[in-house]
């Protein structure tokens, strides 16, 4: 009986969240249109958006909240990753050197960030970015921040700067080799080829 009761409570909570999320989506559409997002773009990009309970869980239990610096770094660095970074540099030497010279940023820093964030582009995340951002916008903890990120992303989609069909990444809404948030993408990203190509990693 206890298990049945717990299941009923959890199921009821999820259903309530999903219903509230649907209502939020209706209201957010009004807000998006006020922010000059076209109805066509909104309907196209947001048609398959769903509430993702696990995103809320990830948000509440981020490793940065409970791991000390030594533990955090040791879990994300290894001699194997260093070797992989060296090979990645050898395969993309001209591109990385060009970026270093053109934007005055050390190639070692580029490689280190890429290694930490996505293991040199081999794992960029599998979460639906639009659903993740929508879930976090719906959630009250940092709603304003994520609502703004979602609006920025919709504007990038509207301008054909990003293909919404390629938007998969982290639970927090970051994507690409360096895991940029939409605002970072808007302000700093340089378009080379395509979001999924190595030459567009930075």
Residue positions per predicted region:
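Classical Sec-dependent N-terminal signal peptides that target proteins to the secretory pathway
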Residues: 1-16
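An acidic, Gly/Ser/Thr/Pro-rich helix-cap/linker signature
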Residues: 18-100
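Export/targeting segments at the very N-terminus of extracytoplasmic proteins
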Residues: 26-37, 81-115, 126-152
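Short, functionally critical alpha-helical segments immediately adjacent to catalytic or ligand/cofactor-binding
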Residues: 32, 43-53, 104-121, 153-158
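Secretory-pathway/luminal and periplasmic proteins that interact with or process carbohydrate-rich
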Residues: 51-58, 118-127, 139-143, 160-165, ...
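Substrate-binding/active-site groove segments that recognize
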Residues: 123, 128-137, 150, 174-191
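Acidic, glycine-anchored loop motifs typical of Ca2+
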Residues: 192-196
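Conserved small/polar residues in nucleotide/adenosyl-binding loops
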Residues: 197-202
